[in-house]
């Protein structure tokens, strides 16, 4: 690891012929689309298994063509535009949301940076391109996609989409800061912002081991950035009908759905690159097989890691309930941002100590990472525990109905009952009271001690 940030050697990029660049761009697009089609079916299958159902099984073998059938159905539906919508922005919003989702994959490495594979006789890297500030490019592109959601909510001319757009904007602002801090810790420790160089620095240990807090922070923020459960507040069906895309139909609605799943694949690919060794084979495989990281095999390891993270998305959706909006904001501003800033300071300190050739830097990083990871998990558990305590609090019984509360008799509403009418005292008790005897009704239970014979003497 280089002790200081320096310009990386990216000479292997920019030398491919134009037709090879087009082929690699088409491959990146096809990788995203095929992964999205598979992920939709995979999600429906996994959720069905969790709910003891069968899931899609009609179109294609094992229902694998269900996503393709749904896409064709959406494109053939009638395209409606509401009267109060700003038509130009209304049509532009799905495009603004979808295009940035495809851009980040351009700097993700699928294999070693060296010329490892041959395509039609040309040796080339398994990456479309790389930049000295590739991760800043990914962070900037992720921020642009939110404009599509905000514009969709504003241009629809409806209340529910507007609220969904505002929620999405607030959620992005709250979680983008913690995501940037998680990225910055990786930059500091690896000494590079190039994606290929970050993967190269993980040859001995993945950053999920060295930077566990950064990994946890990024996983939480990537769920918030993609508006997935349990952080899907911008499209909460319970209070916003459908959220920002309520007024959309046909291919425009399909573009929003496509952008959501492409973003899931993109953030999973970024997590794989930053923390899971990228295209590198897992430790047992790379130890016993020297050729595991050569040829086309890195593409397999990269795809498997991305699919595992996509399964994590699906697992969260099937197990965790949607959090309240105030809990979402509290987690972002009071937990993630403070923890990310403290962790960033610790990583910067360890980086400075490593530059001075101190040996205890890794130990301090491990200890500090473990402590902060436990604190972060405890904060998250406390939020859900507080929610459970509130649900278990005893509900106060409503006050008894008073028919004369307003000064005049009022009939009871449905669910209300009139207070019991006091029974008339028996004649013997009335005579005793007049003669100065004890009041048995006030000393005993309500209604007095009566029998049928005395009650008939009233």
Residue locations for each model-derived region?
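Selective transmembrane helix interface/packing segments
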Residues: 2-458
